[in-house]
Regions:
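Phosphate/pyrophosphate-binding catalytic cores of soluble transferases and nucleic-acid-acting enzymes
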Residues: 32-498
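Detector for intrinsically disordered, low-structure N-terminal pre-sequences
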Residues: 6-7, 13, 27, 40, ...
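Compositionally biased, intrinsically disordered low-complexity segments enriched
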Residues: 4, 19, 25-28, 144, ...
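N-terminal chloroplast transit peptides
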Residues: 1-42
Length: 498
């Protein structure tokens, strides 16, 4: 098995191309073969939507940009932090130059003060697809139009003009990101639980507070009460562990919402495990790809180096500026990078010149990012709808971007049946498709990651770069402390604004 995995890691790209040749003898010209007129080669499938996921640092944006450039496509960002205006370094947001070269939708969509969740993003992503493919938005027929529809329409119209695309041309939606919940909601649909009504939310909160006020046996009485509403909810609450008031309240909200509507079919569909409204239910030909690093050790080193680069580019300065100006979104405070920066800068025992604390912050940031990349790989290995596309890290950046984009293109040219067969552990001829080989290799390499040796590249303790960043960190810490003191000072002691 170990020998097999090693061979797979070295030969994935060649094997993938030969497998696709066998599957698609009549496939269209490669995206990297220019037509005689020099025009972009258009994909033949009118309703094709491409989804590109992958762990942080694997090169998703570069691959997506290559595909968009050849197919008159636009990137639909699936990143929970990039949707907010103001954030940049900590969100790894594309630069203005990159966005001019490849239009990005759902970036800079909302202000820091707004709440923007998976349901909001899914709604906006679906609207983007309809507008890019020149479909009449479903919401117009249903009378529940997206409140951001006008903004999305304008963003797409501006991007068409910038790129010189015809106003009526159907553009290719290329959804790119690593936020797992967002992609799950988009591809597989919303969870089976009903969205609670405002009345149900208020009633549940009042009832929870009443039970919480009953000292010793409040939890038991609350469980008994919810169980009495319906056997479905009894089964649900019996699985709760500890005194999980949050999940109990959520169950109450769903119960009140469903029972108030007096519709037995709603009860039947609750907690069925089935998700409603996946992309395919809208008539799209959805092709999902996970960019899988061929060498996890090398990829993890790339992640560590990327964390250092973010610090050197000014992550601490950006975090401080956003916090002081009250423009740091609540979502960002929980995101890797911003969260560690705030914890470090606002620590209770803070003092200037503390090299050990700064060194610990660097370690915490890198460790959290590595763990997130690992979680992304674990998550998508369990999702059989994503084709694992090996990214050969030993190649130059340009070569691996070209090879990865070409493989995605070729898989999009397969018939639906051949594409789905390429996702299976074994095809009709008894061969192990490349996607499954990549899954196996990724999982096998994960068993050896305990041997990974963390190293610094520029921010070694005592280095010139380390000392420079420590000085910047001290300045940020002082600014945040002064900001906090000003906020908590009595009104008469606060400086007057002229």
């Amino acid at each position: 098995m170990q020998l097999f995995i090693t061979v797979v890691s070295l030969c994935m790209i060649v094997t993938a191309q030969s497998l696709l040749l066998r599957h698609s003898p009549r496939r269209a010209t490669s995206i990297f073969m220019s037509s005689s007129s020099g025009a972009a080669v258009a994909l033949s499938k009118n309703n094709l939507v491409i989804i590109i996921a992958g762990p942080t640092g694997v090169g998703k944006s570069d691959v997506a940009a290559k595909i968009c450039a050849k197919h008159q496509g636009m990137i639909v960002s699936a990143d929970s932090v990039q949707a907010y205006r103001g954030v940049q370094i900590g969100a790894n947001k594309p630069t203005l130059a990159e966005r001019a070269e490849t239009p990005h939708l759902l970036v800079d969509m909302v202000d820091a003060s707004e709440q923007y969740n998976a349901a909001d993003w899914r709604r906006d992503a679906l609207s983007c697809m309809e507008l890019l493919l020149n479909k009449n938005p479903v919401c117009i027929e249903q009378g529940n139009c997206n409140p951001k529809l006008d903004q999305l329409n304008k963003d797409i119209a501006d991007a068409r003009h910038l790129k010189g695309y015809d106003a009526e041309a159907r553009l290719r939606p290329v959804v790119v990101g690593g936020t797992m919940m967002y992609l799950q909601w988009l591809v597989h649909g919303r969870p089976d639980a009903t969205r609670p009504t405002e009345q149900a939310i208020q009633k549940a909160q009042e009832d929870i507070e009443r039970f919480q006020g009953q000292e010793a046996d409040g939890w038991e009485k609350a469980i008994e009460y919810v169980s009495s509403l319906n056997p479905i909810f009894e089964d649900r609450v019996q699985t709760l562990s500890g005194r999980d008031w949050y999940r109990l309240r959520r169950t109450m909200e769903i119960a009140y919402s469903v029972l108030d509507q007096d519709d037995p079919t709603l009860l039947e569909s609750l907690y069925s495990g089935e998700r409603q409204g996946g992309l395919e239910s809208f008539g799209y030909d959805v092709r999902c790809f996970f960019l899988c690093p061929s060498d996890r050790m090398k990829h993890t080193a790339v992640v560590d180096q990327r964390c250092e680069e973010m610090i050197l580019r000014g992550l601490l300065q950006e975090t401080t500026d956003l916090k002081v100006s009250n423009n740091l979104p609540d979502m960002a405070t929980k995101a890797i990078g911003y969260r560690q920066a705030l914890e470090y800068l606002q620590r209770s025992d803070a003092k200037t010149g503390d090299a050990d604390a700064f060194d610990a912050f660097l370690n915490d940031f890198s460790t959290a990012t590595r763990r997130y990349a690992k979680k992304q790989m674990q998550w998508f290995r369990k999702d059989g709808t994503f084709a694992f596309v090996p990214v050969l890290l030993k190649s130059s950046k340009a070569d691996r971007v070209d090879a990865t984009a070409k493989m995605i293109h070729d898989m999009c040219q397969l018939s639906r049946q051949d594409y789905e067969e390429a996702l299976l552990p074994e095809d009709a001829a008894g061969n192990v498709p490349v996607s499954y080989q990549a899954r196996l290799a990724n999982n096998e390499q994960g068993k050896k990651m305990k041997l990974y040796q963390f190293k610094r590249y520029k921010l070694e303790k005592g280095s010139k770069e380390f000392e420079s960043m420590l000085e910047q960190a001290d300045e940020c810490m002082v600014r945040l402390k002064e900001h906090q003191e000003q906020k908590t000072a009595p009104a008469e002691k606060r400086p007057r604004l002229l």
